[in-house]
From Swiss-Prot:
Catalyzes the dephosphorylation of different sugar phosphates including erythrose-4-phosphate (Ery4P), ribose-5-phosphate (Ribu5P), fructose-1-phosphate (Fru1P), fructose-6-phosphate (Fru6P), glucose-6-P (Glu6P), and also imidodiphosphate (Imido-di-P) and acetyl phosphate (Acetyl-P). Selectively hydrolyzes alpha-D-glucose-1-phosphate (Glu1P) and has no activity with the beta form. GO terms for molecular function: magnesium ion binding; phosphatase activity; sugar-phosphatase activity. It comes from Escherichia coli (strain K12). The gene is yidA. This is Sugar phosphatase YidA. The lineage of its organism: Bacteria, Pseudomonadati, Pseudomonadota, Gammaproteobacteria, Enterobacterales. Keywords: Hydrolase, Magnesium, Metal-binding.
Length: 270
């Protein structure tokens, strides 16, 4: 069955290590779109961290979408308006912020516009996230946070060895209550239980009237597994972690070797 929707992760997949898109990948995406295929960037980033890439790819037209916050938000690409949203509550935030201190990890939380930290010793990785995602960073003590805030995701962030120790201390019931997954060796993302990239892709596919077997999803990290499993054609990058390769139908080339372009040429353009 012909592919009608391509869901592409950004960091480690679409993007080179310097956060740019290669000419070959741009050309392959443009060629797929010229054939009427929907292409959607599917990322843990907020809209602010996606918008410039949408412009670069000419993917901010009416009928273009993006999936942000690992599936918590499906948005119209042109203006960021909401198509579907599932957020964590203030009570979730307070519980998880306290848990982060108990397990020994730095912590931050994101709503649609802002990255919040209650850590006075702000983590390097929090600053890094603010810079890469181009989202303002605000210090706010947990008890002073507006209880009406809708948190699209919260994150435990730390040096990989410290973070892995913290993850090992998280009670199993917490891992069952929320979606808990790694997006990088130094990022653990925690979302509403109903949220992952797979449910985000499904929400958009339902809007567009596209079946799972008409979808190709491409990724490299643990947070990409759900959409790779959901899609009819699940593609792992050659630089993907082993668990992603295990669930994929195909392993393409690495992001340094235009792996996204190679997969699009194989499954869409041929």
């Amino acid at each position: 069955m012909a592919i009608k929707l391509i869901a592409i992760d950004m960091d480690g997949t679409l993007l080179l290590p310097d956060h740019t898109i290669s000419p070959a990948v741009k050309n392959a995406i443009a060629a797929a779109r010229a054939r009427g295929v929907n292409v959607v960037l599917t990322t843990g980033r907020p809209y602010a961290g996606v918008h410039n890439y949408l412009k670069e790819l000419h993917m901010e037209q009416p009928g273009d979408y993006c999936i942000t916050y690992n599936g918590a938000l499906v948005q119209k690409a042109a203006d960021g308006s909401t198509v579907a949203q599932t957020a964590l509550s203030y009570d979730d935030y307070r519980f998880l912020e306290k848990l982060s201190r108990e397990v020994g990890s730095h912590f931050h939380a994101l709503d649609r516009t802002t990255l919040y930290t209650a850590n006075r010793d702000i983590s390097y990785y929090t600053v890094h996230e603010s810079f890469v995602a181009t989202i303002p960073l605000v210090f706010c003590e947990a008890e002073k946070m507006d209880p009406n805030t809708q948190f699209l995701k919260v994150m435990m962030i730390d040096e990989p060895a410290i973070l892995d120790q913290a993850i090992a201390r998280i009670p199993q019931e917490v891992k069952e209550k929320y979606t808990v997954l790694k997006s990088a060796p130094y990022f653990l993302e925690i979302l509403d239980k109903r949220v992952n990239k797979g449910t985000g892709v499904k929400s958009l596919a339902d809007v567009l009237g596209i079946k799972p077997e008409e979808i190709m999803a491409i990724g490299d990290q643990e947070n990409d597994i759900a959409m790779i499993e959901y899609a009819g054609v699940g593609v792992a990058m050659d630089n993907a972690i082993p668990s992603v390769k295990e669930v994929a139908n195909f392993v393409t080339k690495s992001n340094l070797e235009d792996g996204v372009a190679f997969a699009i040429e194989k499954y869409v353009l041929n």
